[in-house]
Amino acid sequence: MLLKEVIDNSIDEFKMKSGDRIEIDVEDNLRVSVRDYGRGIPQGKLVEAVSMLNTGGKYDSKAFKKSVGLNGVGLKAVNALSAHFEVKSYREGKVRSITFEKGELKTDQTDKTKDETGTYVYFEPDNTLFKNYSFHDDIVETMLRNYTYLNAGLTIMYNGRRIKSRNGLEAVSYTHLRAHETEAI
């Protein structure tokens, strides 16, 4: 569920036509990074956007009527439930990086960058809250494949592997119909 909340923000960027690529890496089935190439979180609001309730950038915004995220609550929940949480916002030639440990701000730094705009989130769920957890590759890959079917043109890189659906659900429907057509004959 935590991973889904982070990815939903990236999907919202895609739906707003701000980035068509998302990169997800899972380390040792315990830690996750998600990088999108959308607009990036406004750097002046970055700490608030990931740690203070009722401060999400999508809250009350007509631009996000089709938002799949939790309107500003998702990243805050991931932060609160993580032993380590890091977010970077790339905008206007700068990257602002902040790090939290168990919800407490530890570092906040802004530097110049030539990297593309977007957002990077890295987190490790708190094992005192989630006993014996791990991210299961098959479940994560199925979830990501579903995202590409529901969002034609979206490219997701998962641990270096490309997951893409050119035609979204249209391709799934065609494949499904062809399979049943063969069975009927």
Regions found by a protein language model. Give the residues of each.
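Conserved short strand/loop->alpha-helix "switch" segment adjacent to the catalytic nucleotide/phosphoryl-transfer site
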Residues: M1-K4
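Hydrophobic residues in the alpha-helical elements that line and stabilize the ATP-binding pocket
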Residues: V6-N9, G74
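Conserved beta-strand-loop-beta-strand hairpin that lines the nucleotide-binding pocket
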Residues: D8-Y59
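Active-site catalytic microenvironments for nucleophilic, acid-base chemistry
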Residues: E13, H84, K88, T182
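GHKL-type ATPase core
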Residues: L30-S33, Y37-G40, K45, K58-E170, ...
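Conserved small/polar residues in nucleotide/adenosyl-binding loops
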Residues: T175-T182
